[in-house]
Every structure is written in C-alpha cells, then in structure tokens.
C-alpha cells in the first residue's frame, strides 16, 4: 500500500497546494492532507480562517473523495514553535503518526511526503536517515516546485482579487470584497446597486423584505415581529449565498442589510398603526447581533435623504416626508456606529451620476 502525505497551513488553500495534493493522490493509494497551525494566528484570525475553520473547510472540500483523509495538528497544543528544530519535528511527526492510526501497521507500506519547500525536503530526509530518531512514516520525500504555478498564500492575502482563480473554492468567501449601499427609502439604492452589478458583472443582493411583502401581499401595517425576524435571517442568508456563489469573482454588492431592517423596526415601534413593541425590537436587535458574524462589509456607501420620494405603490407613505426620512437616517447612522461599521462608511451626497461614478471608481480600485 502506497501512502502520500502533504501538509500546510492552508491560509488559504490554493492551486499550489492542490498541485501537491493531486500528485500525492494520483501516485498513491491514499493521501493524507495535514492541516497545521497555531491558536490566535493574526494572519488567519483577522480573516476568519482559524485552524479549526481551515480544517473544517478542507474536510468538506474532500468529503466525497475516498482516497483523501484530512488530519489536524495544533502546534500550540503540542507546545512547539515555528523553528524547524529536531525536537519540534519529533513531536510533530509523532502527532501525525498517532492520528493516522493505521490498523495494518507499517509492514509493506511505503510513505511518500510531498512538499513545496526545499527546507522541508532537507528536514524530512534528515529524520528519515537518522537511525536514532527515524520515523516509520517517512520513506520518500518528493519536492514539487511551483515554477509552473507560482502562487503562495501570502500573495493571495495581499491581493486576493488578482489571484482569485488560484484560491480553492471553499476559501474564496473569506477574501471577497463586500460592498453595501444603504440609506433610507427612495434614495436610489436599488438602482445604483443594480447598475454597478450590471457594469461589472458582479453578484448583488436585493432587499429581501420588499420581495417577501410583495409575495405575501403584505403592507407595512401588517408586519409583526415574526416578519422582521424573517427579514433579518433571510437577508443575511441571501447575501451569504451571493458571497459563496461561483459567480463571485471577488466582489459582491448589496443594497440593504440588517441595519436597515432594524432602522425600520425602530421607526415602526413609534408608529401606532403597526403592532411592534419595544420588547419586540430588543428581540430583533439581539438576533441581528447573533447573525452579524460571518459577513464583513469592506465598504459601506451611505445615501442621506435628499431625493424626491417616489411612490411606487409599495411604499409606506407615512415614512415619505423629509422629516421622517431624516429621523430614520439618524437611526441608521446610530445603528452603524453601534454595530461597529462606521469606520467603513463613506457618505454619497452627489447626484445620481456622481454617486455611480464614485462607487464605480471604488470597485475599479479593487480590481487593479
């Protein structure tokens, strides 16, 4: 039985890693992919790719591949640092060996390690050739250079859109540039979002609440806390689907998020025509906090109230006055600050063309 072994931090996994994995798989009967790293790694944690998350993504990626088995090694738990000392290698290799738990033992099994770094070749060969500290799971070491596919995790982290097609698909969502266009009603958010999406051919997320109300034939005065809970959950789900979709080439844009839902919920608590209470609002805000994790906005364009209110037959006209729209805008600003998004905000206070050109300019800067 021939066994291939690859290992790495995979932050993110990319085609360079897959070159190793696919070769190890094709040249052996089974292939082990060892995901390793530390707790509290700044480069990983800041983008949400903790060791456990990377391990989970890779397991999911290969769940239908009977040849590939995914292991995890937490270097922090092993008490080893990033140096390539003999003792560190001994501890690390023993952990890998124990996890393999090969029921057949090591008789008649050939273990080949596939690595993309020359230093790893030397270290593993030294362990194999040292009669005192040799490990039974090292027979051969194969170096797979990246001259034909020069890519690294560092290059991707520094410029993900440039190397988007090199990123393994499950990891792409963590490098997506997510843009939100927000504001009160009738300021041109939806039109601006669609126009930018059309111009660049990027996925966009629309206001779920509007679609929901049209489908069920509901007016604003029919809404209850249950409807608002549905808005919060499904809006997040729709945006996440766009971020994870194969159509995402690095940038996603949305014309609403849960801050807008909360803005309207606050306003409707004050409206005697709508059955929404302060306690209902507290429930909704807690739900919004709970589902905030996962979607990060890289840029938020905020449209202040200035345009003529357009009655499209679906809008709640009680909210149509400039005074009410200004109150709602102030609520939205307060929510953006409360939820920690204000540092991402840029106020768009130009005409329709000027606002389009500013967002277009921002998207183009991300594509350079």
Predicted feature residues:
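Nucleotidyltransferase catalytic core that binds NTPs
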Residues: 1-177
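Hydrophobic anchor at the beta1->P-loop junction of P-loop NTPases
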Residues: 181
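The conserved Walker
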Residues: 185
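Conserved glycine(s) of the Walker
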Residues: 188
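Hydrophobic positions on the alpha1 helix immediately C-terminal to the Walker A/P-loop
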Residues: 192, 196
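Conserved substrate/cofactor phosphate-moiety recognition/catalytic segment
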Residues: 198-238
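Glycine-rich phosphate-binding loop used to anchor ATP phosphates in small-molecule kinases
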Residues: 230-295
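A glycine- and Lys/Arg-enriched "phosphate-lid" helix/loop adjacent to the NTP-binding pocket
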Residues: 268-337, 346-354
